[in-house]
Design a protein with these regions (language model features):
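Flexible phosphate-sensing "switch/lid" loops adjacent to ATP/NTP-binding sites
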Residues: 1-7, 15, 31, 39-44, ...
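N-terminal pre-Walker A segment at the start of P-loop NTPase domains
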Residues: 17-24
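Pre-Walker A adenine-sensing motif
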Residues: 25-34
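Conserved glycine(s) of the Walker
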Residues: 49-50
């Protein structure tokens, strides 16, 4: 289970137990693979908290230090899973070779633009062994609010003050928070600061030893003048609004910030 409430998980457990079967929650000792290289993992307490931008910043910092960095992305398994067992992306042609979806491309292209290699696929032990051959450091770019597949040497977890309280009420996000070495409170430039303080207090309650950082998540728009005074139809990031349960995303914030006259309701 991923990005669901604790209550949801236990209702499912109750259904299973009532039928006489066991319900098991597997921990990191059972599910994480040990790398021969140092691993920095970037995960979150909810979908849409800002993992990808954080992962890319980590890659930028490590590259500036002269490290060979290879990223590994949490799986997005579409299409032929056998053919997608191990995927390596270093050039734009690789995206065509693996027939990547738009969702996959928006995750991989920023790494290619940085001249960084990113792996993904299905067999994550085979992926790791390939990545280790060309990396000084492996960066795990997590998905949803899942735990990292690789045993991290530094575990960074991103929290979202727009959903204050969710860091303690969603699975497996709370486990990520409790295991974190570094917690980043993201989006402080757009959040109510009372919610930032609430999140900070919750972090202190369950993981007082973690290093806590506050981060802005500034929006950039290629042609902001095209928005001002216009009626705008916003197409948001899907997961953030669906299982992420946000009422709005960066698109709405950008439209409002850059002077949209009206947000169009697309419903018939």
């Amino acid at each position: 289970y991923s990005d669901v409430t604790h209550e949801y998980v236990m209702h499912k457990a109750s259904q299973v137990l009532a039928l006489g079967a066991d319900f098991r929650l597997m921990g990191t000792h059972s599910t994480q693979i040990k790398s021969q290289r140092p691993v920095v993992s970037v995960c979150a307490v909810r979908t849409g908290s800002g993992k990808s931008q954080t992962s890319r910043q980590v890659v930028d910092i490590l590259q500036a230090m002269g490290q060979r960095v290879v990223a590994v992305r949490h799986p997005m398994p579409y299409g032929n899973l056998i053919a997608q067992s191990v995927q390596r992306f270093a050039e734009y042609d690789d995206l065509d070779e693996y027939e990547c979806t738009i969702e996959e491309r928006e995750e991989y292209e920023p790494y290619i633009d940085r001249r960084a290699v990113i792996y993904a696929g299905v067999d994550y032990e085979a992926i790791l062994r390939k990545a280790e051959t060309e990396a000084d450091i492996v960066v795990w770019d997590g998905g949803n609010n899942d735990l990292p597949f690789y045993q991290p040497d530094l575990h960074i977890v991103v929290v979202d003050p727009h959903r204050a309280g969710h860091e303690l009420s969603y699975h497996p996000g709370e486990a990520n928070l409790r295991a974190a070495n570094v917690v980043i409170i993201n989006k402080v430039d757009t959040a109510d600061y009372a919610n930032v303080l609430k999140v900070r207090a919750n972090i202190q309650a369950v993981n007082p030893g973690a290093l806590v950082l506050e981060a802005a998540s500034p929006l950039t728009v290629a042609h902001p003048e095209a928005i001002r005074g216009k009626r705008v139809l916003v197409i948001e990031d899907g997961p953030t609004l669906t299982h992420g349960e946000m009422a709005y995303g960066a698109g709405v914030v950008a439209a409002q910030r850059f002077g949209a006259a009206e947000l169009i309701d697309p419903r018939p």
